[in-house]
């Protein structure tokens, strides 16, 4: 961690805990700040607040008292999940108190260079691939950010010889100021989080902030398969490298089934361990970032031919009596399920789908389901999905949840079939998180092996 004194004796409010808020509070406390933490969860149920109190940090829990901001704070570190129209945030901004997120703090304390990855889909897989490749190459890469490892906590421990490989959400990027990654990567840009940002333009503007402090000495990696991303190349001061499955570009690309970086042959596209065009894009993006950090081809090939996927993200679980089973519980929207389906032969595929009903239809999914062998539906959207399947003459069965769906569909399947959980819906009708949904599916798989 850098030896910085700017926070010493400064009164700082950390708004919202969870892991990132707790990490920020501990880092700031170590840097000599006078830290106050405010979180809405009652103290008795708030493990993070209890730990911080033991560290001598002032904690205020159970509500967000607006008069707390009368204490003349020099800075607010906001949990990224808290919206900017929150009364506490609005009051802080009215008082000219700077509001940042924890990734800005991570940048300020980090001695290590940062690879920042953002975008709508593919962030976690691409982030993990990059870190795995660099580590396979003998380098020291540290996963951090929106991937489950608080950025400031990892940055605090990182050395100058490490590389921070940081997954970044639009929520996190809205709260940066001086944040400047050495390499930034935008996987793609689609419609998402409009309930938070208010518009697609605001969402994309938040993502675009990843490069706002970069110079020509830094690198921005863009997806030239997407025209929207291609047009961004002229709007940055950073040096742009691209990836594409459709044409030769300045970074990584595919030509006649072969993957190249610039003019250098890397490997056959067919050797990739993960199925689907979207995972080919993820692999190309990871190759560009890894090559920019000096990774050798051997490390790239080793990882890309053996990578089993990130948990709950088109994760290959194994076989049950000759049937392959995949867990894609992270597919919480139609687009994610469309991308998953693109990697399989529909004629041998059974799709397990359903979940929270957000009021939308599934018409956009119909073309992707042509010739599907069968479906199992569950959750609030079960009836909508069943009607769609019947319209397309797809055999369809209803089940209570993901665990029963797998058990009940097995007698309908044949050797050589593939079973894919890719719900196309959020999990909150039956589960707290998509992780819980996926874990129960994994448990069902293990019980049937």
Curated annotation (Swiss-Prot):
Q: What class of enzyme is it?
A: ligase
| GO cellular component, as recorded | cytoplasm
Q: What is the lineage of its organism?
A: Bacteria, Bacillati, Bacillota, Bacilli, Lactobacillales
Per the record, the major location class is: cytoplasm
**NCBIfam families according to UniProt:** murD (TIGR01087)
Pathway field: Cell wall biogenesis; peptidoglycan biosynthesis
Task: Give a short account of what the protein does.
Answer: Cell wall formation. Catalyzes the addition of glutamate to the nucleotide precursor UDP-N-acetylmuramoyl-L-alanine (UMA).
User: A GO BP term, please?
Assistant: regulation of cell shape
Q: Where does ATP bind?
A: 119-125
Determine the domain of life of the protein's source: Bacteria
Protein's recorded name: UDP-N-acetylmuramoylalanine--D-glutamate ligase
EC number assigned by the record: 6.3.2.9
> Which of UniProt's keywords are assigned here?
ATP-binding, Cell cycle, Cell division, Cell shape, Cell wall biogenesis/degradation, Cytoplasm, Ligase, Nucleotide-binding, Peptidoglycan synthesis
Reactions listed under catalytic activity? UDP-N-acetyl-alpha-D-muramoyl-L-alanine + D-glutamate + ATP = UDP-N-acetyl-alpha-D-muramoyl-L-alanyl-D-glutamate + ADP + phosphate + H(+)
Q: Does the keyword Cytoplasm apply?
A: yes
